[in-house]
């Protein structure tokens, strides 16, 4: 089976500046830059670096404002959001700035339900909304996972539906594992569901006899996420399932995967009864390699289980946003049988705000190039 993004273009932090200078060297480019409004101190890193290297760029900036509800713990960080917005206003003229607001939760009806992923798919409604842009950059550094999965999926679908047009689609992310550790999710959602547009037909009645294989990509301090995900995977007592934890290796900290195994030893091997041979490893700092490794594992499972009419695949990313890009690409390429199960939160807590801000300049910027010039035959 040929993989869509193999070969691929991936730009690390050291190559960023020269790459943008070379790519936007002529004046024919028209760029749509999408980012999230939030308290994450990395919100403007990608945009600032791009404009430093390409100051004359023809750019429109679309900022996604997401409302987590009146009870969200994130409201206490409004002062950081204000600082981020002040920085953004120094980078972009107001006439080049578009704002789109979406609600994370739907309060209509008796129960509060997550709606951010569905609402995110409407930020860009139709192909004519992007037709004029030669380049689109989505910076996911300060966007919630459910938001950028749906947004990226929608843009890929729109671009793929117009194959005779050429749009360069990039994802950027300012990666910093230490900052990620300082941001703790709170008020985790109890009623888990697969992300909008990434259901993988897993819950269709006609598909429920197929075994379900779950690939949770692990990061630090995600005990509750893993338990909730496992409860969802095993809720149908008549359905066969298997769990294949994915650990980050190689990684910037070479002992990180060992530390994660120690942290989750009881949960994985005693509570979930996982066989050691089911554990996978994939590169912490290369989302395309994660995409390839996951794709190959999925292919092997489907071939092995073809005799009983195949299987369904669920992927969850409890790790970095950089790694999550790999799972996004796997799910998009295999939408009929791979679903994304996300554990949503009602807000966030910063464990050490001073340290949080100090770490900003230690972040590394990565670029994944998904569609456009390199992929045209």
Q: What residue ranges belong to the model's regions?
A:
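Long, low-complexity, Lys/Arg-enriched
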Residues: 1-135, 143-377
């Amino acid at each position: 089976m040929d993989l869509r993004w193999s070969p691929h273009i991936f730009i690390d932090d050291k190559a960023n500046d020269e790459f943008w200078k070379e790519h936007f060297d002529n004046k024919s480019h028209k760029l749509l830059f999408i980012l999230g409004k939030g308290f994450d101190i990395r919100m403007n890193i990608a945009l600032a670096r791009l404009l430093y290297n390409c100051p004359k760029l023809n750019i429109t900036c679309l900022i996604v404002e997401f409302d987590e509800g009146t009870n969200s713990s994130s409201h206490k960080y409004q002062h950081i959001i204000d600082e981020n917005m002040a920085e953004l206003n120094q980078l972009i003229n107001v006439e080049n700035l578009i704002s789109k607001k979406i609600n994370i939760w739907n309060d209509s009806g008796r129960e509060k339900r997550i709606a951010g992923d569905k609402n995110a798919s409407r930020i860009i409604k139709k192909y004519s909304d992007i037709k004029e842009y030669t380049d689109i950059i989505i910076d996911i550094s300060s966007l919630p996972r459910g938001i950028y999965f749906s947004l990226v999926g929608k843009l890929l679908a729109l671009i793929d539906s117009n194959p005779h047009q050429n749009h360069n689609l990039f994802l950027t992310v300012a990666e910093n594992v230490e900052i990620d550790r300082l941001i703790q999710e709170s008020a985790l959602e109890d009623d888990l569901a697969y992300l909008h547009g990434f259901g993988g037909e897993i819950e269709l009645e006609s598909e429920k006899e197929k075994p379900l294989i779950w690939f949770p990509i692990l990061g630090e301090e995600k005990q509750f996420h893993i338990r909730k995900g496992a409860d969802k995977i095993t809720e149908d007592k008549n359905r066969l399932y298997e769990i294949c934890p994915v650990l980050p290796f190689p990684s910037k900290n070479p002992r990180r995967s060992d530390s994660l195994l120690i942290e989750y030893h009881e949960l994985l091997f005693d509570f979930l009864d996982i066989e050691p041979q089911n554990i996978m490893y994939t590169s912490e700092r290369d989302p395309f390699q994660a995409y390839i490794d996951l794709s190959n594992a999925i292919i092997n499972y489907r071939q092995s289980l073809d005799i009983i009419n195949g299987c369904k695949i669920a992927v969850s990313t409890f790790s970095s946003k950089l790694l999550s890009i790999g799972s996004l690409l796997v799910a998009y390429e295999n939408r009929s049988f791979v679903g994304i199960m996300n554990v949503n939160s009602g807000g966030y807590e910063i464990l050490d705000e001073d340290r949080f801000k100090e770490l900003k300049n230690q972040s590394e910027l990565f670029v994944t190039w998904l569609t456009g010039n390199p992929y045209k035959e």
